[in-house]
C-alpha cells in the first residue's frame, strides 16, 4: 500500500495504524468529500458488511452521491484496499485487515428490517391494490424536465407516502395540498377515499393534465392548479389545509420557497411531509435552521424512504421527514436560483449509443431529453460531468 500525496520531506517511518489514518484523510481529500474521512469509513463499513456490493447500493446505504462513491471506490482499488468483481466491490486481504484492525469492525450482518426495508411500514392488500393502479398511470408520465429539477419517484414510493400519512393520522378527514406533484403522490392518496380534500399546485401543465385524466377515469376528486410557486398562492388556497406534502428542488432556497408556500396553505399550524436528498453536514445544518426558523420541528425522519427512476446522482434515493408546525412563519430566500442547475451549474457529456458521438448538454442544449444525434440516435449515456463557476 502506498500513501497518496507527500508526507513531509524524505522518508518517513510510520506504523500501520498511522498509514491507515493518513490513507483515510488523503482519500477523502483526493475525492473532495465534504463529509471528510468519516464518509470513507462508512463506505468501507458498508462493503465489509454487504460484500460483494454494487457502487449504487453503497451510495444508497451511505447516503452519499453516486459519483463520490465511484471516485472513492476507484482510489481504494488503486490502494489495494478493494478489488472489483463481477458481483461488485469486495475487500482485499489488506482491506479486511484495515477494516478489522484499524476500524475495529467485527459484525457483518445488517439489522435493517428486510420486510419494510427500513421504511417502518408495510403495504397491506388495500394499499397493494392501490399501488397496482398507480403503476399503470405512472407509465403515462411525460419525459422529466431536468431544468426544473424533476425526478419521478417510483409508484411504490408514492404509495408508501400515502400509507405513511395514513399511519400517522394525517390522511383521514384531512385537507391535503401537494406543493408540486411530479411524483403523482396525489394519486394513491385519492384512491384511499380517506381525505376530505386533495389539491395539487404545479407549474408543469403536462403533470396536471395527467392527474385530471386520472381523476376522471378513477372517479376521484383532485383539484389541480397551474401555478409558479415563485409567486404567492392563490387566495382561495391560503390557510385552508391541514397537511402539505412536497419534494422541492434540492437547494436551500428551493426548500424555503416550497415550504413557505406550504405555510401559506396551512396558516399558523399544520403538518408537512418533506422529501429531500441526503446532504453533507454543512448543508444539512442550513436546511435544519431554515426548517426550524419557519416554526417546524422534525418529528420524524426516515432515510432512504423515497426511490426515483433514473436519478443516479442521488443514488436514486432520498429521505422523508414529517414536520410539525406551530406559529409558522414564511421564510423565502432567493427565488431566482431555486433549481440545482442554477446554483451548481454543470456541463454533462453524453455518448450516442448508436454512433458513439459525444454531445455537450447544459449550454445550447439544456437537457438530454431534447438531444437528438445527427445519426438519428435518441439513446445516450452520460460519460462525464464538469462543474461550472457561477457567473
From Swiss-Prot:
One of its GO terms (molecular function) is transferase activity, transferring alkyl or aryl (other than methyl) groups. It holds the Pfam family BpsA_C. GO terms for biological process: polyamine biosynthetic process. InterPro entries: BpsA (IPR014435), BpsA_C (IPR002723), rRNA_MeTrfase/Polyamine_Synth (IPR051720), SAM-dependent_MTases_sf (IPR029063), WH-like_DNA-bd_sf (IPR036388), WH_DNA-bd_sf (IPR036390). This is Uncharacterized protein MJ0675.
Amino acid at each position: 500500500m502506498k500513501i497518496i500525496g507527500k508526507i513531509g520531506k524524505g522518508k518517513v517511518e510510520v506504523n500501520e495504524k498511522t498509514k491507515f489514518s493518513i490513507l483515510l484523510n488523503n482519500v477523502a481529500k483526493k475525492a473532495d468529500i465534504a463529509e471528510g474521512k468519516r464518509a470513507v469509513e462508512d463506505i468501507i463499513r458498508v462493503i465489509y458488511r454487504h460484500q460483494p456490493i454494487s457502487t449504487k447500493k453503497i451510495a444508497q446505504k451511505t447516503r452519499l452521491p453516486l459519483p463520490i462513491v465511484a471516485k472513492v471506490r476507484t482510489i481504494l482499488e488503486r490502494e489495494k484496499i478493494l478489488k472489483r468483481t463481477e458481483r461488485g466491490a469486495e475487500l482485499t486481504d489488506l482491506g479486511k485487515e484495515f477494516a478489522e484492525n484499524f476500524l475495529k469492525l467485527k459484525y457483518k450482518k445488517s439489522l435493517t428490517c428486510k420486510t419494510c426495508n427500513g421504511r417502518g411500514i408495510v403495504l397491506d392488500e388495500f394499499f397493494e391494490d392501490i399501488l397496482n393502479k398507480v403503476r399503470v398511470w405512472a407509465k403515462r408520465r411525460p419525459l422529466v424536465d431536468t431544468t426544473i429539477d424533476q425526478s419521478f419517484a417510483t409508484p411504490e414510493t408514492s404509495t408508501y407516502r400515502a400509507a405513511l400519512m395514513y399511519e400517522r393520522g394525517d390522511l383521514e378527514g384531512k385537507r391535503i395540498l401537494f406543493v408540486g406533484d411530479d411524483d403523482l403522490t396525489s394519486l394513491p392518496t385519492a384512491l384511499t377515499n380517506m381525505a376530505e380534500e386533495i389539491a395539487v399546485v404545479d407549474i408543469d401543465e403536462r403533470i396536471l393534465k395527467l392527474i385530471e385524466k386520472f381523476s376522471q377515469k378513477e372517479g376521484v376528486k383532485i383539484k389541480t392548479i397551474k401555478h409558479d410557486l415563485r409567486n404567492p398562492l392563490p387566495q382561495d388556497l391560503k390557510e385552508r389545509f391541514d397537511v402539505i406534502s412536497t419534494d422541492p428542488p434540492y437547494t436551500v432556497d428551493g426548500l424555503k420557497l416550497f415550504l413557505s408556500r406550504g405555510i401559506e396553505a396551512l396558516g399558523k399550524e399544520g403538518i408537512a411531509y418533506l422529501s429531500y436528498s441526503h446532504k453533507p453536514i454543512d448543508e444539512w445544518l442550513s436546511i435544519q435552521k431554515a426548517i426550524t426558523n419557519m416554526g417546524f420541528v422534525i418529528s420524524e425522519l426516515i432515510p432512504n424512504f423515497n426511490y426515483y427512476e433514473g436519478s443516479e446522482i442521488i443514488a436514486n434515493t432520498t429521505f422523508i421527514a414529517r414536520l410539525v408546525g406551530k406559529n409558522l412563519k414564511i421564510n423565502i430566500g432567493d427565488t431566482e436560483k431555486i433549481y440545482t442547475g442554477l446554483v451548481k451549474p454543470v456541463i454533462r457529456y453524453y455518448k450516442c449509443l448508436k454512433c458513439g458521438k459525444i454531445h455537450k448538454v447544459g449550454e445550447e442544449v439544456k437537457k438530454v431529453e431534447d438531444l437528438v444525434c445527427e445519426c438519428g440516435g435518441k439513446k445516450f449515456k452520460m460519460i462525464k460531468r464538469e462543474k461550472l463557476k457561477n457567473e
